[in-house]
């Protein structure tokens, strides 16, 4: 358990005040999914510094398993005896486009429609991409991007400027007035937002503290 030496530096449990201090490293596929938990955590544990990094699902899982972060949040269920998980919620995958892209704007898009459109995908390792492509293949439809981009913010900008149609979970759409979101009417693809941490580190004070904050309504 030599990896836990880092916790003597990054966090500790003050027996005198029963408060947690130090730093917690969080890697998430989107900050949106943990905003409310972070608010609760900061209110309960104001002395803990939060280091938040954004990455795709593969990067998040690797960071947890490599001891590069205490908490991970991704848009898919995770399995493995080395991991403990908490389901935060589910959200359907939606197509997004510039309001000027379609004329008129359709109510929804089918996989057949998508195959004819310029698609913008996130990089390999994005669970949104993997889920969408997998479901389309089940219906014998192959979806291919004209642009592949790293990061959700870059995807939003390309889509908002009319370069193609992108995909995000409903929770990640945000408030960009340039965008319209559309149902994928032949699809049931959804994201299951999952909080994870290593089983071997379940007694680390900042991890226990974050889980406590996640339980708050």
Outline where the language-model segments fall.
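Alpha-helical "hinge/linker" immediately C-terminal to small N-terminal DNA-binding modules
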Residues: 1-18
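Flexible hinge/capping segments at coil-to-helix
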Residues: 18, 83-119
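Central regulatory/effector-binding core of bacterial HTH transcription factors
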Residues: 22-80, 149
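Ligand-binding cleft/hinge of the Venus flytrap
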Residues: 37-46, 112, 129-142
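Hydrophobic hinge/microswitch elements
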Residues: 59-60, 65, 75, 127-182
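Short beta-strand->loop
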Residues: 84-94, 170, 177-192
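Secondary-structure junction motif
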Residues: 103-104, 109, 118-139, 203-207, ...
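A late-sequence structural motif
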Residues: 181-217
